[in-house]
Amino acid sequence: MDIRVEYLSTSKTILFAGSELRYYLSKINNMISFSQDTEQTDETYRKKICLGLFPDSECSSDEDEYEIEISHLSGHIKGSNPRSVLLGVYQYLTLLGCRFLRPGKEYEWIPSVPHIEEIQISRRQKARYRHRGVCIEGADTPENILEFIDWLPKLGYNSFFLQFELPYAFLNLWYSHKNNPLKKPEAFSLEKAAEISSVIDRELQKRSLKHHRVGHGWTCSVLGQNTLGWVPSDTTLTKEQENMTALIDGKRGFFQGIPINTNLCYSNPDVIASFAEKVTAYAMLHPEVDYLHVWLADASNNHCECDTCKKHLPSDLYVHILNEIDRALTQKQLDTKIVFLIYEELLWAPIEEKLLHPHRFVMMFAPISRTFLQSYEIPEQLPAPVPYQRNQITLPVNLTENLSFLAQWQKIFHGECFDYDYPLGRAHYGDMGYLHISRIIYEDIHRLTDLKLDGYMSCQELRCFLPNGLPNYIMGKCLFGTDCSFEELVEEYFQAAYGKDWESCFSYLSRLSSLCNCDYCNGKGSRQNPAVAKNMKQVAQTAETFLSVCAAQDKAALPPVQQLFWKHLDYHREYCILLSKALFLLADGRTQEAGEAWKTFTYYICSQEDTFQKALDVYRVVEVSTNYTGFPLIENF
């Protein structure tokens, strides 16, 4: 069968979509061949697939929509922009039976479709939400990042957020092999990070993915510091620089020694001017960035207590700076979109200031302290937020309380707004089956419209695939829009990943999820918890029982992708046994024994990291478990 792919546009993204279409169709049916692509129409070719854009009146750079009309391997895939054409190609392949289960081609289920020429597909679909993305966290290799970017549009995502001016912090966490004493640190530099960043930029542009950038780090720039991550600095600030930092307990300087956690004296005219200048200069140099995130420092209870600052809410000072940035960008005739953050102290809405040009801005709701035991529910009446007390706040866990803060901001800002959420940042380590956290994601996304939020950005590790990639799979599908129930999406995923025995895997992982507590592992509540202890004992028993299912599986008879998923499930089984033992002892109040069990678990995952590097972020598991769950840091074995 000879097919010609015809391009109705010279867009690089549409050309890339064509190359992807050719690659996967040739995998689906090895009888398919492709004639040389050309822009010229030649009716002698009976089978032709055209890729192009809708008429100008139906095009939009922001709203993703595609149309698939293909019968007998002839027809078209069109979109509202080049990215939408690429999304349409991947949806066509999905309708043919392809399943993109994890980043990396080895984790794709590609069916054999012998009579593909008999298939007729007709679909037109518009994305349910405008903002559909993932933000980098954890320790990452360049390959981890690039494979994740390649995976995003296959599931319907349209955005990627590369935090900081350079992704040095996340790459260096990998190359330094922090939290894995079994691996030797490797040299890494800002120069190398810049090289990798350029490659990442090109891959985003190839797919026309919306490029989000920076976030935290502007406060470092104002102080003349590089953003190297959440690490201490021994730099001595000049007197002028020190006077720019927040006054806390009568002292100025780096907050707890960490530049990125250091807020500034935001009433200081020099700080305001420098902040606006830094953002404007970056925007001028980086027109490829679609959404420039302008945040303050990380951490909480670290705002300036000088006589001028303490007269104002942090959010009032923040909005004043945002207006100055808007004014500077306007003077330079830059239309850069600025994303501002509702987070920690900034949850309290301003009472004095307002954004003068709301169309410039996108509001991002970031409920970092929320519970993941439940999904969002909207009560008939929201309570009033607790009064703000400078540097004495307690972050809200309750979802209703979090939503009360959002509601106050939505009274004064009526522009674009999306949810920046954290199910795959820390909480997922507390759900060993990944079914609970996947359902939370499913339910949260289906409630975004009711919350007046136009999308979702997941702040997460790029290596969160143990036991599988179901959470991100469901996230992408739901954000673009699906009529499938949660159960239908799970079945679709598990059938492709595990084959004929998928129901055994589903029952097993569901049981694990039912026994787990995301919030406990995320540091919420007392460390001594009889219910958690009881459940962790059952987790170990459940995992040990599943050994017989793994042993009975004739893995050699499975397709390669399913062999990989079963291999990961076998590793994951031992992971669960060792981790649940440590959690049982911790929750039972046997701290010393818990530390020993934690050391055994840590050695296991560190020793296996090379084999399962793409599935589990060892650095992040250890970081979360020592900073939040309550285990000791193991520096050597």
Question: What is each model feature region?
Answer:
Residues M1-R128:
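Contiguous, structured surface segment used for ligand recognition
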Residues T10, S57, R128-L406, Q410-F413, ...:
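Aromatic-lined carbohydrate-binding surfaces of glycoside hydrolases
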Residues F16, L87, A273-S274, S504:
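Short, solvent-exposed alpha-helical surface patches in well-structured domains
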Residues N29-I32, F100, G215, Q333, ...:
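Long, hydrophobic, amphipathic alpha-helical segments used as structural scaffolds
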Residues T38-E39, R46, K452, K477-F637:
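Catalytic domains of carbohydrate-active enzymes that cleave complex glycans
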